[in-house]
Amino acid sequence: MRHYIFSLFVISLSFSQNLQIRVVGKMQMDIPVLGPFKMTFDQTVAPGFLKAEEKIEAERFYAGWLMNGETGEIMIDGTEKILKYDKDEEEYWLQSPEDYFKEPDTSSDDTKSVSFSFSSDDEDDTPPIFTRTGGKEIESVHGFRTKKWITTIAFSEEKMMVFEEWFVDKLPLMRLSDSLESAIKTKFNPDQDTVELEQFDFSSNIFIREMDSLTTLKPIPGHAVKINFLVYEESDDPKMAVGFEILELYAEPVDTGYFVIPEIYERIEND
């Protein structure tokens, strides 16, 4: 049995050496002040290579002025710095691993985080009510065979969070992609024990785990490939809406020529 498991591990490792994994996803948000905007990410990773691009599009003018852009980064094992680039400006620059992995300044306005809270004029300590439906029918979402779940966390009759989630049982290509991404980033940052990967995770499972003493619901097993997160407060229209979905996830033979930028890009110093 041990020999069989070891053989499977060797086959899997050899299999990944000849492949690159591409994942394309989209996040849409409609939040107070900024309004609606969309972020698309496109990442391809192979053994010793990583290329990631991100595009942000906001509908409101002032939000677009602050946020719109299309940027990318490339990591190649054996090089000393990370290549960063701006597709709109057709410019690129080099960034040291020290700056790349530096802890972000959370006090800065240039942080990609969103927070929200429920307003309340009373001192009602009633615990939230958790309900969940679904998980029976198979639905196809971008080629994934999923089961849809709807989880509601109600703080009152007018204040609640609703999660619409499409889960698959397993997503082995995503696990392989995360493993390859972690490996290349660890090589650029060897002094850190573990490298944190950017994850778009705001599923109901987070709230279930954090509030497990208040509910008998268990985290949904598997991997979410699509999530709609809605916050309601004294209105039939959501106060905030966030959507995330994986549009593409596939493996193909490694093409090292993909991990480059156009020759017309101009190098700049970007401190």
Label each PLM-derived region with a short phrase.
Residues M1-Y4, G143:
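Positively charged n-region of N-terminal signal peptides that target proteins for export
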Residues M1-R2, F15-S16, A52:
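Intrinsically disordered, low-complexity regions enriched for glutamine and histidine
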Residues H3-L13:
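Sec-dependent N-terminal signal peptides
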Residues N18-D271:
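Extended soluble regions of mature proteins
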